[in-house]
A protein has these predicted regions:
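Short, conserved phosphate/pyrophosphate- and ester-handling motifs at nucleotide-, phospho-/glycolipid
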Residues: 38, 168, 298
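Internal alpha/beta scaffold segment
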Residues: 157-201, 222-254, 260
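Terminal RNA-binding accessory module
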Residues: 1-70, 74, 111, 153, ...
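Short edge beta-strands and adjacent turn/loop segments
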Residues: 197-211
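Short, acidic/hydrophobic/Gly-rich beta-strand patch recurrent on exposed beta strands
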Residues: 20-25, 149-152, 217-219, 360
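Short, aliphatic-rich beta-strand segments
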Residues: 205, 212-221, 286-290
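Rossmann-like S-adenosyl-L-methionine
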Residues: 1-7, 13-17, 223-374
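Extended interfacial segments that mediate partner engagement and assembly in macromolecular machines
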Residues: 59-70, 79-190, 210
Length: 374
């Protein structure tokens, strides 16, 4: 099979990370990403290495028997989600199979290596679960009207305005619409990747699931020809804060980024309203989060994960701290370390970034934890 070959195949399985294995009528196997087991797909081979072919998905000819769910209206065109047509329980089965294969490929099967595979825990929420989104400014087609959303599947340039995105709640959708309406009305140009001209780049939205606190960060270039930036940003702040939300605004920020790369990069941030941080709660502890700091994007799912880790530490003796010392390596701002602190004698967080260590100490003090060291 050569580069440029166009063919069809049925997806046999999907390996991590998101690599569908499509089998042709001749028995050849091709890696095709963004596919689902059981789909019949058309592909074009774009890479052949060590006799392994990889292809780009061109079309889903036949749906998989697994696809029984109604997706969000942007599914298929939006590059954000892959498995929305598959029932959640089946998605978990797919992930379980992928993880078991990774482990067995590395150290052998349960019987061979003596480990116990305890299964998979699902998220308490199956929709509107994300607490963070990074939307991009652009257009849905060349020279089209301003768009704000996610990249189209398979495209580096074109966007989809995801006004009905189902993995975030209504507050996210309200913020997206208010932002797009405001800048469209004022004819503000987005940053073109090809020409490196324009102002609008990204919109970062974070909302705490437990506290309901919201922070929005508008990321732009410093190219302000043709308008008064101070007046424009004041109007943006007003456009956001005068809408109705279930949560409450903690801060509105403006970050400058003149780098060529299409990533959110902080080259200076100003506070337009409120604070530059917000608080989220996990398992009864409180955490201070800034726009660019790492935090699990599914708060309720994170609680399931960390509660499971706590159970491992406690072992069979649920009523004893066991005098155990837990080491949190590459601890960052110490979220995991603090969540483990209530079930052990001492936690030691190890981190090379000095700013993260300072933040970890601050959060530990906020939660009154005296058995955490960073």
């Amino acid at each position: 099979m050569k580069k440029g070959f166009r063919g069809t195949g049925t997806v046999e399985r999907v390996d991590f990370p998101n690599k569908g294995i499509a089998v042709t009528d001749d028995g050849d196997r091709v890696i095709v990403k963004n596919t689902i087991p059981g789909q019949k797909v058309e592909f074009v081979v774009n890479k052949v290495k060590h006799q392994r072919a990889e292809g780009r998905l061109m079309e889903v000819i036949e749906k998989s028997p697994l696809e029984t769910e109604e997706p969000c209206p942007h599914f298929g065109m939006c590059g954000g989600c892959t498995y929305q047509t598959v029932p959640y329980e089946k998605q978990l089965d797919m992930k379980l199979t992928q993880v078991k294969k990774l482990i067995s490929d590395a150290i052998g099967t349960e019987k061979e290596s003596g480990y116990e595979f305890i299964g998979i825990h699902g998220s308490p929420k199956k929709s509107e679960y994300r607490n963070k989104m990074e939307f991009s400014f652009g257009d849905e087609y060349k020279d089209g009207p301003l768009a704000l959303g996610m990249h189209k599947r398979g495209s580096f340039y074109d966007l989809v305005t995801v006004s009905d995105c189902q993995i975030v709640d209504e507050d996210f959708r309200t913020i997206l619409k208010a932002t797009l309406d405001y800048f469209s009305k004022n004819n503000i140009p987005y940053f073109h990747r090809a020409t490196h001209k324009g102002y609008l780049r990204h919109l970062l939205v974070r909302k705490a699931t437990k506290t309901g606190e919201i922070i929005v960060d508008l990321v732009t270039t410093t190219q302000t020809e043709g308008f008064n930036e101070e007046e424009l940003l004041a109007g943006f702040r007003y456009a956001l804060l005068t809408r109705h939300y279930d949560g409450r605004f903690k801060g509105v920020l403006h970050t400058q980024n003149d780098s060529v790369a299409d990533v959110v990069k902080n080259e200076g941030t100003d506070v337009l309203y409120g604070d530059s941080y917000f608080y989220e709660e996990l398992l009864g502890l409180k955490f201070k989060i800034t726009p660019f700091s790492f935090f699990q994007t599914n708060s309720l799912g994170a609680e399931v994960l960390y509660e499971t880790a706590r159970e491992f530490i406690l072992g069979d003796d649920k009523d004893s701290l066991n005098g155990k010392t837990v080491y949190d390596l590459y601890s960052g701002t110490g979220t995991i370390a603090q969540l483990m602190a209530p079930v052990c004698k001492e936690v030691v967080g190890v981190e090379i970034v000095e700013e993260a260590v300072c933040a970890a100490k601050e959060n530990a003090a906020l939660n009154g934890l005296d058995n955490c060291k960073f």
